[in-house]
Amino acid sequence: MPLTFSVWQALLNNFVVERAAFTGAEIGMLQSLREVPGFLAFTAVFVLLVVREQRFALGSLLVMSVGVALTPFFPSTYGLYATTVVMSMGFHYFETINKSLTLQWIEKTQTPHFMGKAMAVKAAGALLAYSSIWLLMEWVGFGFTAMYLLAGGIGVVITLALWVAFPHFPEGAVQHKK
């Protein structure tokens, strides 16, 4: 997830100014809309009434990746607002469920160590994303469309691979659905 999200975030301000002629007002609205799904992440508990956590997490990753891949195809104010909200829904729901699953599946004694390693992997993914942007745009000549498609496509492929590789883990804690 850090790879896909980091590409989206790193390219966003330049993309919206160059392709959609955003001013500070539109960028401010875009960033505000990006946070709306974060405020609504509590609604995950309602989704969990009908969808298992693992599937919900993978579905959220898929939604985020598709939102990133669609970004360059809607270089208008409302198009970018829409793709940003789609991407952000996936991002915030995944972050919410990811913490829950980690705490369920990892032994309590190993949790701090595991979460530290996970943060290190996220940071490495972000650094890989930033260096890839520079390399591919500066040296290979990729444009915004290619970069967003590549990042979103990689996210989709990784998510589908995870879906196949890990069909279903048993739930570590029984979730009460009352």
What is each of the regions a protein language model found here?
Residues M1-G38:
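Helix-loop boundary and gating motifs at the non-cytosolic
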Residues H113-S131:
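Glycine-rich segments within core transmembrane alpha-helices of 12-TM secondary carriers
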Residues Y93-I106:
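Intracellular juxtamembrane helix-capping segments at the cytosolic ends
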Residues E18-R19, F42-V50, L127-Y148:
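Transmembrane alpha-helix termini and helix-breaking/packing motifs in multi-pass membrane transporters
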Residues L49-L61:
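Cytoplasmic membrane-interface "Motif A"-like loop-to-helix N-cap segments
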